[in-house]
């Protein structure tokens, strides 16, 4: 928590002097009104989550409020860290949903740009059961869920593919993510009972991840 907290503070201190120069910077570097995009994410479990979770994968959506050096970044992600087939058309899925916001600093012009960011937000750990194909009534069933706070810090590289009115770039990056202590169902922690109900085994730990992302960023002018 200390490392990510220091990263958040450090990025905030770096970007504060730029606020007063924002209009001048826009005159020199007209980067447009911001950008949005989507990335495919893969998360490597760290610490206690390495024992209780598994490699997670999912999608992330983000928006950046300015095309200049200093901007506000807002992003949300969904990833699944455990999927099990229980038999007879019943499967279970354990997931993490996260939303956060914070400063982003982008450096460089032209086809190659680098950026760094830090965010603070919240996350939900939840598990569902899907009864498709089993002849059971209903579709997905919510089994378990818990909220917690989350912080992240990371950076990446933007490789421009086109400019014009709608600039497009490949977005390649990584971040450290820390979810504060939370109760969740570990990998393999859902067991189906003879009556069709489920028993959920829970653990309570901090959840640390290293998340890698690859996607596309689309500029707004």
Give the residues covered by each predicted segment:
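Gram-negative (and chloroplast) outer-membrane scaffold detector with strong preference
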Residues: 62-151, 162-168
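Short glycine/proline- and aromatic-enriched beta-strand/turn motifs that initiate or cap beta-hairpins
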Residues: 20-68, 72, 78-81, 86, ...
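Short sequence motifs at beta-strands and strand-loop junctions characteristic
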Residues: 30, 51-56, 93-97, 143-152, ...
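Cleavable N-terminal export/targeting peptides
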Residues: 1-31
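Predominantly the C-terminal beta-signal and adjacent terminal strand-loop region
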Residues: 160-221
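Transmembrane beta-barrel strands of outer-membrane/channel proteins
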Residues: 34-44, 74-80, 103, 116-124, ...
